[in-house]
Amino acid sequence: MQSRHVPPPQSDAGEDVSGRIEVARAPMPPEPAAPLPINPVLVWIIRLGAYLPNLALFGVMIAVWQFTSSVWLPRIDPQMAVLMPAPTTIVVTAAAMIMSGELLYHLVASLKREATAFVFASAAIPIGMAMGWWRPVYNQMNPIVELLRPIPPLAWIPLSILWFGLGDGQNEFIIFLGMFFPILINTIMGVRNIEPNLVRAARSLGASERRVLTRIVLKGALPQIVTGIRIALGFGWMALVAAELVGANSGLGFLINDARSMLRTDIITVGMLTIGIVGLAIDAGIRALTRRTLLWSLAMAK
């Protein structure tokens, strides 16, 4: 007679007579799949796709320009076709000027004047901090600022020629005027927008006035100051070209004016495009700096 295995009796709690407890084991979770390798070419294509509408519009504009200059205008008015060079002609002229070093020479001269004027215009930062922080200083200086600020920099050209003569000094003075007031006004506004609780907290902890100005006020106003610098560099770049049209023997403005006297519209266009490209590059750099300083200011506020 065969014996039969009989399971031990269990209580309601799941415990058998021998005292053993049976526990159900949960299934092991599956191992996570390895991440797929990122294809850099695919990432580049996706990023490029975001700019396709802009590139398409730019291509259409170039095509219309090329057709107008090389096909339509020569049939309508050959003289006008000479005054409106085709994009292919401009590319050839730009390549020749780059190879000869002429374009680089004038570009460096303009950038040097811009940088020199910016060094002097940066004095607007401490002046603006003083005007924004101390009310008596603001009350004394603001009428003078508001009297001079509406005067366009180009209106100073006759006086600047009499004061400095024709040359770098006159050009840098005009650029300085274009840069100074945007930096000054934005610095004043940045100082006035400082959170008062931060200042009170620093003073309650025993911070000196100099420490409050350098650690709280300056850092808090920095995004607004950088915005003023961005605006100032744009204004200064425009004032630079206008000043070089009148009193300079080098620079992009001089290049354009000299080409005008020779009816070289291709050189004029190359100079104009160079001004636009450099201005775009300067603005892009300042915008990147603005984002960094804004994140820094927000982190400090927290």
At which residue positions do the language-model features occur?
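Generic hydrophobic transmembrane alpha-helix motif, especially the helices
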Residues: 146-182, 189-190
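Transmembrane-helix boundary motif in ABC transporter permease subunits
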Residues: 116-145
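Short cytoplasmic-facing helical segments at TM-TM junctions of multi-pass membrane proteins
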Residues: 143, 186-231, 252, 256
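Membrane-spanning helices that line or support transport/gating and their immediate boundary helices
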Residues: 67-75, 129, 140-143, 186, ...
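Periplasmic/extracellular loop-to-transmembrane helix junction in inner-membrane transport proteins
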Residues: 37-47, 71-120
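N-terminal signal-anchor/first transmembrane alpha helix
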Residues: 36-69
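C-terminal transmembrane helix and the adjacent membrane-cytosol boundary/short C-terminal tail
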Residues: 135, 269-302
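Transmembrane alpha-helices
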Residues: 173, 177, 209-243, 266-270, ...
